[in-house]
Protein backbone atom coordinates (compact mmCIF):
# COMPACT_ATOMS: atom_id res chain seq x y z
CA UNK A 1 0.00 0.00 0.00
CA UNK A 2 1.45 3.32 -1.02
CA UNK A 3 1.59 6.16 1.42
CA UNK A 4 0.82 9.64 0.15
CA UNK A 5 2.71 12.59 1.55
CA UNK A 6 0.84 15.64 2.74
CA UNK A 7 2.77 18.90 2.52
CA UNK A 8 1.74 21.37 5.20
CA UNK A 9 3.22 23.56 7.87
CA UNK A 10 3.29 21.86 11.28
CA UNK A 11 0.74 23.68 13.39
CA UNK A 12 1.67 24.35 17.00
CA UNK A 13 -1.23 25.73 19.03
CA UNK A 14 -0.12 27.88 21.93
CA UNK A 15 -1.98 28.73 25.12
CA UNK A 16 -2.45 32.32 23.97
CA UNK A 17 -4.57 31.08 21.06
CA UNK A 18 -7.09 29.35 23.26
CA UNK A 19 -9.87 30.96 25.23
CA UNK A 20 -12.66 28.54 25.94
CA UNK A 21 -15.21 31.24 26.73
CA UNK A 22 -15.38 31.46 22.93
CA UNK A 23 -15.10 28.73 20.33
CA UNK A 24 -11.83 28.39 18.43
CA UNK A 25 -11.20 26.93 15.01
CA UNK A 26 -8.34 26.36 12.60
CA UNK A 27 -8.21 25.57 8.88
CA UNK A 28 -5.01 23.68 8.05
CA UNK A 29 -4.22 23.70 4.30
CA UNK A 30 -3.04 20.45 2.72
CA UNK A 31 -1.44 19.66 -0.64
CA UNK A 32 -0.20 16.48 -2.25
CA UNK A 33 1.53 15.70 -5.52
CA UNK A 34 2.85 12.70 -7.42
CA UNK A 35 6.48 13.08 -6.25
CA UNK A 36 5.57 12.10 -2.70
CA UNK A 37 3.50 9.01 -3.57
CA UNK A 38 6.06 6.53 -2.24
CA UNK A 39 7.37 8.55 0.66
CA UNK A 40 5.97 8.85 4.15
CA UNK A 41 5.40 12.10 5.91
CA UNK A 42 2.91 12.92 8.64
CA UNK A 43 1.58 16.20 9.88
CA UNK A 44 2.26 16.76 13.56
CA UNK A 45 -0.15 19.03 15.39
CA UNK A 46 0.77 19.97 18.92
CA UNK A 47 -2.50 19.54 20.81
CA UNK A 48 -1.70 19.48 24.52
CA UNK A 49 -3.20 22.96 24.87
CA UNK A 50 -6.63 21.57 24.01
CA UNK A 51 -6.96 20.25 27.56
CA UNK A 52 -9.85 22.02 29.27
CA UNK A 53 -12.18 21.89 26.30
CA UNK A 54 -15.19 19.57 26.22
CA UNK A 55 -14.14 17.95 22.95
CA UNK A 56 -12.28 18.58 19.69
CA UNK A 57 -14.21 18.27 16.41
CA UNK A 58 -12.21 17.51 13.26
CA UNK A 59 -13.40 17.31 9.65
CA UNK A 60 -11.58 16.92 6.34
CA UNK A 61 -12.10 18.16 2.78
CA UNK A 62 -10.02 16.90 -0.17
CA UNK A 63 -10.30 17.91 -3.83
CA UNK A 64 -8.51 15.97 -6.58
CA UNK A 65 -9.37 13.63 -9.41
CA UNK A 66 -12.05 11.04 -8.77
CA UNK A 67 -9.58 8.13 -8.72
CA UNK A 68 -7.54 9.73 -5.95
CA UNK A 69 -10.54 10.63 -3.85
CA UNK A 70 -12.21 7.22 -4.19
CA UNK A 71 -9.06 5.12 -3.69
CA UNK A 72 -7.54 6.95 -0.73
CA UNK A 73 -8.14 6.28 2.94
CA UNK A 74 -7.57 9.20 5.29
CA UNK A 75 -6.74 8.54 8.93
CA UNK A 76 -5.80 10.56 11.98
CA UNK A 77 -3.60 9.09 14.72
CA UNK A 78 -3.95 10.62 18.19
CA UNK A 79 -2.27 9.04 21.24
CA UNK A 80 -1.84 5.71 19.42
CA UNK A 81 -5.54 5.63 18.50
CA UNK A 82 -6.37 5.66 14.80
CA UNK A 83 -9.50 7.45 13.62
CA UNK A 84 -10.65 6.92 10.03
CA UNK A 85 -12.35 9.75 8.18
CA UNK A 86 -15.64 8.46 6.76
CA UNK A 87 -17.22 10.14 3.75
CA UNK A 88 -19.93 12.45 5.01
CA UNK A 89 -23.44 11.05 4.86
CA UNK A 90 -24.60 14.68 4.72
CA UNK A 91 -22.63 15.70 1.62
CA UNK A 92 -25.18 16.47 -1.07
CA UNK A 93 -22.85 16.78 -4.04
CA UNK A 94 -22.43 14.17 -6.77
CA UNK A 95 -18.93 15.40 -7.63
CA UNK A 96 -16.67 12.37 -7.08
CA UNK A 97 -13.56 14.58 -7.13
CA UNK A 98 -14.46 15.97 -3.69
CA UNK A 99 -14.15 14.07 -0.42
CA UNK A 100 -15.88 15.62 2.59
CA UNK A 101 -15.77 13.71 5.87
CA UNK A 102 -18.13 13.23 8.77
CA UNK A 103 -16.95 14.93 11.96
CA UNK A 104 -14.54 13.02 14.19
CA UNK A 105 -14.95 13.89 17.88
CA UNK A 106 -11.74 13.62 19.89
CA UNK A 107 -11.68 13.47 23.69
CA UNK A 108 -10.19 16.47 25.44
CA UNK A 109 -7.26 14.50 26.84
CA UNK A 110 -3.63 15.33 26.27
CA UNK A 111 -2.57 14.50 22.74
CA UNK A 112 1.14 15.12 22.24
CA UNK A 113 0.92 14.98 18.45
CA UNK A 114 -1.62 14.27 15.76
CA UNK A 115 -0.58 12.45 12.60
CA UNK A 116 -2.70 12.74 9.47
CA UNK A 117 -2.11 9.98 6.91
CA UNK A 118 -3.40 9.32 3.41
CA UNK A 119 -2.90 5.89 1.86
CA UNK A 120 -3.91 4.55 -1.52
CA UNK A 121 -5.32 1.08 -2.10
CA UNK A 122 -4.53 1.37 -5.81
CA UNK A 123 -0.92 0.37 -6.55
CA UNK A 124 -0.97 1.67 -10.11
CA UNK A 125 0.98 4.79 -10.96
CA UNK A 126 -1.39 7.64 -11.65
CA UNK A 127 -1.07 11.37 -11.66
CA UNK A 128 -1.74 12.93 -8.28
CA UNK A 129 -2.66 16.55 -7.92
CA UNK A 130 -4.91 17.18 -4.96
CA UNK A 131 -5.41 19.73 -2.23
CA UNK A 132 -7.66 20.30 0.71
CA UNK A 133 -7.74 21.21 4.37
CA UNK A 134 -8.27 19.90 7.86
CA UNK A 135 -10.84 21.80 9.92
CA UNK A 136 -10.41 21.80 13.70
CA UNK A 137 -13.12 23.16 16.00
CA UNK A 138 -13.16 23.59 19.79
CA UNK A 139 -16.49 24.68 21.35
CA UNK A 140 -17.00 27.36 23.92
CA UNK A 141 -16.90 26.06 27.48
CA UNK A 142 -20.00 24.61 29.05
CA UNK A 143 -19.59 25.93 32.58
CA UNK A 144 -22.86 27.81 32.24
CA UNK A 145 -25.79 25.44 31.69
CA UNK A 146 -28.06 25.73 28.69
CA UNK A 147 -30.53 28.55 28.86
CA UNK A 148 -34.00 27.18 29.53
CA UNK A 149 -35.68 26.32 26.22
CA UNK A 150 -37.95 29.11 25.12
CA UNK A 151 -41.69 28.68 24.70
CA UNK A 152 -42.38 29.96 21.18
CA UNK A 153 -45.44 31.86 20.18
CA UNK A 154 -47.99 29.72 18.37
CA UNK A 155 -47.12 29.71 14.68
CA UNK A 156 -49.86 27.42 13.43
CA UNK A 157 -51.80 28.90 10.54
CA UNK A 158 -54.69 26.50 11.17
CA UNK A 159 -57.23 27.55 13.78
CA UNK A 160 -58.22 23.91 14.30
CA UNK A 161 -54.65 22.67 14.82
CA UNK A 162 -53.57 22.82 18.45
CA UNK A 163 -50.21 21.03 18.21
CA UNK A 164 -47.71 23.57 19.59
CA UNK A 165 -44.18 24.13 18.37
CA UNK A 166 -42.13 22.55 21.20
CA UNK A 167 -39.83 24.55 23.45
CA UNK A 168 -36.36 24.86 21.91
CA UNK A 169 -32.85 26.26 22.34
CA UNK A 170 -32.49 29.12 19.86
CA UNK A 171 -29.66 29.87 17.44
CA UNK A 172 -28.57 32.91 19.44
CA UNK A 173 -27.90 30.56 22.39
CA UNK A 174 -25.98 27.62 20.92
CA UNK A 175 -24.54 29.86 18.20
CA UNK A 176 -23.69 32.84 20.39
CA UNK A 177 -19.97 32.76 19.56
CA UNK A 178 -20.84 32.90 15.85
CA UNK A 179 -23.15 35.88 16.55
CA UNK A 180 -26.04 33.92 15.08
CA UNK A 181 -29.56 35.27 15.06
CA UNK A 182 -32.80 34.20 13.42
CA UNK A 183 -31.48 35.02 9.93
CA UNK A 184 -29.60 32.62 7.68
CA UNK A 185 -25.82 32.89 8.17
CA UNK A 186 -25.03 33.61 4.50
CA UNK A 187 -27.98 35.25 2.67
CA UNK A 188 -30.15 34.86 0.78
CA UNK A 189 -32.35 32.18 2.30
CA UNK A 190 -34.48 30.02 0.02
CA UNK A 191 -37.95 28.81 0.98
CA UNK A 192 -40.02 25.80 0.05
CA UNK A 193 -43.45 24.26 0.54
CA UNK A 194 -42.88 21.40 2.98
CA UNK A 195 -44.56 18.11 2.06
CA UNK A 196 -42.10 15.56 3.50
CA UNK A 197 -40.44 15.38 6.94
CA UNK A 198 -36.97 13.79 6.79
CA UNK A 199 -35.35 12.16 9.83
CA UNK A 200 -31.55 12.03 10.17
CA UNK A 201 -28.88 11.05 12.66
CA UNK A 202 -25.66 13.00 13.06
CA UNK A 203 -23.53 9.81 12.94
CA UNK A 204 -21.32 11.53 15.51
CA UNK A 205 -20.70 11.20 19.22
CA UNK A 206 -23.25 9.41 21.41
CA UNK A 207 -22.15 11.05 24.67
CA UNK A 208 -21.37 14.63 25.60
CA UNK A 209 -21.64 17.07 28.48
CA UNK A 210 -21.96 19.92 25.98
CA UNK A 211 -24.65 19.14 23.43
CA UNK A 212 -25.08 22.73 22.33
CA UNK A 213 -21.34 22.64 21.57
CA UNK A 214 -21.99 19.56 19.42
CA UNK A 215 -24.68 21.50 17.53
CA UNK A 216 -22.18 24.36 17.06
CA UNK A 217 -19.58 21.90 15.73
CA UNK A 218 -22.06 20.67 13.10
CA UNK A 219 -22.74 24.27 12.09
CA UNK A 220 -18.99 24.91 11.80
CA UNK A 221 -18.41 21.82 9.63
CA UNK A 222 -21.42 22.52 7.41
CA UNK A 223 -20.34 26.12 6.80
CA UNK A 224 -16.54 25.85 6.70
CA UNK A 225 -15.88 22.27 5.54
CA UNK A 226 -18.92 21.65 3.35
CA UNK A 227 -19.15 25.27 2.20
CA UNK A 228 -22.88 25.65 2.88
CA UNK A 229 -24.85 28.79 3.78
CA UNK A 230 -25.71 27.58 7.27
CA UNK A 231 -26.24 24.41 9.26
CA UNK A 232 -28.04 21.97 6.98
CA UNK A 233 -30.77 20.77 9.34
CA UNK A 234 -33.90 22.69 10.24
CA UNK A 235 -34.01 21.17 13.74
CA UNK A 236 -31.79 19.01 15.95
CA UNK A 237 -32.60 16.92 19.05
CA UNK A 238 -30.11 15.77 21.69
CA UNK A 239 -30.36 12.54 23.76
CA UNK A 240 -31.98 14.45 26.63
CA UNK A 241 -34.87 15.41 24.37
CA UNK A 242 -33.76 19.04 24.04
CA UNK A 243 -34.74 20.62 20.72
CA UNK A 244 -32.38 23.04 18.94
CA UNK A 245 -33.30 25.54 16.26
CA UNK A 246 -31.28 24.76 13.13
CA UNK A 247 -30.95 26.66 9.88
CA UNK A 248 -31.71 30.37 10.05
CA UNK A 249 -34.39 32.04 8.00
CA UNK A 250 -37.52 30.97 9.83
CA UNK A 251 -40.32 28.58 9.04
CA UNK A 252 -40.13 26.67 5.73
CA UNK A 253 -36.56 27.75 5.00
CA UNK A 254 -34.99 25.19 2.66
CA UNK A 255 -32.24 23.19 4.32
CA UNK A 256 -29.28 21.18 3.00
CA UNK A 257 -29.70 17.59 4.12
CA UNK A 258 -31.34 15.46 1.43
CA UNK A 259 -28.83 14.21 -1.19
CA UNK A 260 -29.14 17.44 -3.16
CA UNK A 261 -32.95 17.29 -3.33
CA UNK A 262 -33.93 19.66 -0.55
CA UNK A 263 -37.11 21.17 -1.99
CA UNK A 264 -40.35 20.28 -0.20
CA UNK A 265 -38.55 18.84 2.84
CA UNK A 266 -37.90 19.63 6.47
CA UNK A 267 -34.83 17.98 8.01
CA UNK A 268 -34.59 17.03 11.68
CA UNK A 269 -31.39 15.47 13.02
CA UNK A 270 -31.16 13.31 16.15
CA UNK A 271 -27.69 13.65 17.67
CA UNK A 272 -25.87 10.33 17.85
CA UNK A 273 -24.88 7.34 15.75
CA UNK A 274 -27.86 5.00 15.56
CA UNK A 275 -25.97 2.32 13.73
CA UNK A 276 -24.32 1.77 17.15
CA UNK A 277 -26.87 2.75 19.81
CA UNK A 278 -30.62 3.28 19.98
CA UNK A 279 -32.25 6.71 20.30
CA UNK A 280 -33.46 7.56 23.79
CA UNK A 281 -37.16 7.67 24.65
CA UNK A 282 -36.76 11.41 25.33
CA UNK A 283 -35.47 11.98 21.80
CA UNK A 284 -38.30 9.99 20.25
CA UNK A 285 -40.93 11.82 22.32
CA UNK A 286 -39.57 15.19 21.22
CA UNK A 287 -39.35 14.00 17.60
CA UNK A 288 -43.01 12.99 17.67
CA UNK A 289 -43.98 16.33 19.19
CA UNK A 290 -42.09 18.22 16.47
CA UNK A 291 -43.40 16.06 13.62
CA UNK A 292 -46.97 16.39 14.90
CA UNK A 293 -46.63 20.18 15.03
CA UNK A 294 -45.29 20.46 11.48
CA UNK A 295 -47.55 17.81 9.94
CA UNK A 296 -50.64 19.38 11.49
CA UNK A 297 -49.60 22.90 10.51
CA UNK A 298 -48.95 21.96 6.87
CA UNK A 299 -51.90 19.50 6.59
CA UNK A 300 -49.48 16.61 5.96
CA UNK A 301 -50.85 13.10 6.50
CA UNK A 302 -48.37 11.67 9.00
CA UNK A 303 -48.83 8.06 7.87
CA UNK A 304 -49.34 8.91 4.20
CA UNK A 305 -47.08 9.16 1.16
CA UNK A 306 -46.86 11.19 -2.03
CA UNK A 307 -44.63 12.15 -4.95
CA UNK A 308 -41.48 14.20 -4.41
CA UNK A 309 -38.83 15.57 -6.78
CA UNK A 310 -36.16 13.23 -5.42
CA UNK A 311 -35.11 9.62 -5.71
CA UNK A 312 -37.18 7.43 -5.79
CA UNK A 313 -39.92 9.93 -6.69
CA UNK A 314 -42.49 8.72 -4.14
CA UNK A 315 -41.92 8.61 -0.39
CA UNK A 316 -43.60 8.37 3.00
CA UNK A 317 -44.35 11.84 4.34
CA UNK A 318 -42.19 10.90 7.35
CA UNK A 319 -39.09 9.25 5.89
CA UNK A 320 -35.48 8.53 6.71
CA UNK A 321 -32.63 10.26 4.88
CA UNK A 322 -31.71 7.09 2.98
CA UNK A 323 -35.23 6.82 1.53
CA UNK A 324 -34.57 9.87 -0.64
CA UNK A 325 -31.13 8.88 -1.95
CA UNK A 326 -29.86 6.42 -4.52
CA UNK A 327 -29.34 2.85 -3.22
CA UNK A 328 -26.38 2.37 -0.85
CA UNK A 329 -25.68 6.13 -0.73
CA UNK A 330 -26.22 6.37 3.02
CA UNK A 331 -27.51 4.35 5.96
CA UNK A 332 -28.77 7.53 7.71
CA UNK A 333 -30.65 7.72 10.09
CA UNK A 334 -29.09 4.45 11.26
CA UNK A 335 -30.80 1.08 11.57
CA UNK A 336 -31.80 1.57 15.23
CA UNK A 337 -33.71 4.74 14.38
CA UNK A 338 -34.91 3.79 10.90
CA UNK A 339 -36.75 0.72 12.19
CA UNK A 340 -38.78 2.97 14.51
CA UNK A 341 -40.16 5.17 11.72
CA UNK A 342 -43.19 2.96 10.99
CA UNK A 343 -44.40 3.31 14.58
CA UNK A 344 -43.39 7.00 14.59
CA UNK A 345 -45.75 7.63 11.67
CA UNK A 346 -48.66 5.99 13.48
CA UNK A 347 -47.91 7.65 16.82
CA UNK A 348 -47.59 11.05 15.17
CA UNK A 349 -50.94 10.54 13.43
CA UNK A 350 -52.54 9.62 16.77
CA UNK A 351 -50.95 12.65 18.45
CA UNK A 352 -52.52 14.89 15.82
CA UNK A 353 -55.96 13.30 15.95
CA UNK A 354 -56.27 13.02 19.74
CA UNK A 355 -54.48 16.19 20.83
CA UNK A 356 -54.00 18.62 17.97
CA UNK A 357 -57.29 18.46 16.08
CA UNK A 358 -59.69 17.56 18.89
CA UNK A 359 -61.84 20.42 20.21
CA UNK A 360 -60.17 21.45 23.47
CA UNK A 361 -61.53 23.15 26.56
CA UNK A 362 -59.05 24.42 29.14
CA UNK A 363 -60.35 23.63 32.61
CA UNK A 364 -59.99 26.29 35.29
CA UNK A 365 -61.23 26.87 38.80
CA UNK A 366 -64.60 28.17 37.61
CA UNK A 367 -65.34 24.71 36.19
CA UNK A 368 -65.39 23.16 39.68
CA UNK A 369 -67.99 20.38 39.94
CA UNK A 370 -68.52 20.39 36.18
CA UNK A 371 -67.69 17.30 34.11
CA UNK A 372 -64.15 17.02 35.56
CA UNK A 373 -62.92 18.24 38.93
CA UNK A 374 -60.99 19.35 40.99
CA UNK A 375 -59.10 21.93 38.94
CA UNK A 376 -56.16 21.89 39.09
CA UNK A 377 -55.91 18.22 40.07
CA UNK A 378 -53.42 16.80 42.51
CA UNK A 379 -53.88 13.29 43.92
CA UNK A 380 -57.26 12.50 42.39
CA UNK A 381 -59.62 13.46 39.57
CA UNK A 382 -63.40 13.00 39.41
CA UNK A 383 -66.16 12.93 36.82
CA UNK A 384 -69.75 12.49 37.97
CA UNK A 385 -71.24 11.54 34.63
CA UNK A 386 -68.64 9.84 32.42
CA UNK A 387 -65.75 7.38 32.40
CA UNK A 388 -62.29 8.73 31.55
CA UNK A 389 -61.20 7.09 28.27
CA UNK A 390 -57.87 8.88 27.65
CA UNK A 391 -55.40 10.71 29.88
CA UNK A 392 -52.58 11.91 27.61
CA UNK A 393 -49.61 14.20 28.17
CA UNK A 394 -48.38 16.82 25.68
CA UNK A 395 -46.08 14.25 24.04
CA UNK A 396 -49.06 12.03 23.24
CA UNK A 397 -48.09 9.42 25.85
CA UNK A 398 -51.13 7.64 27.28
CA UNK A 399 -51.43 7.51 31.10
CA UNK A 400 -54.95 6.06 31.40
CA UNK A 401 -53.52 2.73 32.60
CA UNK A 402 -52.17 4.57 35.67
CA UNK A 403 -55.66 5.70 36.72
CA UNK A 404 -56.79 3.75 39.80
CA UNK A 405 -60.39 3.79 40.97
CA UNK A 406 -60.75 5.75 44.22
CA UNK A 407 -64.54 5.46 44.39
CA UNK A 408 -67.48 5.41 42.00
CA UNK A 409 -66.72 8.82 40.51
CA UNK A 410 -63.03 9.45 41.24
CA UNK A 411 -59.62 8.16 40.19
CA UNK A 412 -56.34 8.14 42.10
CA UNK A 413 -53.73 9.93 39.93
CA UNK A 414 -51.02 10.36 42.57
CA UNK A 415 -48.63 8.12 40.61
CA UNK A 416 -48.83 10.33 37.51
CA UNK A 417 -46.15 13.05 37.12
CA UNK A 418 -47.19 16.68 37.39
CA UNK A 419 -47.76 18.56 34.15
CA UNK A 420 -50.30 19.40 31.47
CA UNK A 421 -52.63 16.61 30.30
CA UNK A 422 -55.43 16.12 27.78
CA UNK A 423 -58.45 14.26 29.18
CA UNK A 424 -61.16 12.62 27.11
CA UNK A 425 -64.43 11.21 28.44
CA UNK A 426 -66.27 8.22 27.00
CA UNK A 427 -68.89 9.37 24.51
CA UNK A 428 -67.68 12.99 24.54
CA UNK A 429 -66.11 14.69 21.48
CA UNK A 430 -64.56 17.46 23.56
CA UNK A 431 -61.02 17.13 24.94
CA UNK A 432 -60.21 18.84 28.25
CA UNK A 433 -56.87 20.43 29.01
CA UNK A 434 -56.06 19.85 32.70
CA UNK A 435 -53.05 20.71 34.85
CA UNK A 436 -51.97 18.07 37.36
CA UNK A 437 -49.99 19.46 40.30
Regions found by a protein language model. Name each.
Residues 398-416, 428-431:
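Glycine-centered tight-turn motifs at strand-turn-strand junctions
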Residues 112, 417-420:
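A glycine-anchored, Pro-Gly-centered beta-turn/N-cap motif
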Residues 194, 241-242, 391-404, 421:
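Short, glycine-anchored, charge-dense loop/turn motifs used at functional sites
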Residues 353-382:
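Residue-level detector of functionally pivotal "anchor" positions at catalytic/ligand-binding pockets or at interdomain
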Amino acid sequence: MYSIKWLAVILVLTVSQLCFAQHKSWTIPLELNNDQLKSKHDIGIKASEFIGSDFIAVSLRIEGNDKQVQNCTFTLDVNDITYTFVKSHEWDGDDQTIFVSDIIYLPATKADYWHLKATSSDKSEYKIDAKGFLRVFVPEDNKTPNEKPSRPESTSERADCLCPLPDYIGRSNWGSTFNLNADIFTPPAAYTTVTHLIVHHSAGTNTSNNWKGVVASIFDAHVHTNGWQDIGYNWLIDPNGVLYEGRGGGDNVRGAHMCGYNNNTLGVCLLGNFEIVSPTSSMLAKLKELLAYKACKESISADGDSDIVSYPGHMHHISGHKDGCSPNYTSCPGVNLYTKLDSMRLETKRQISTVCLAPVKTLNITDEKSLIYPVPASDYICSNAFEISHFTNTYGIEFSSFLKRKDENCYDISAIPSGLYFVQLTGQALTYRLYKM
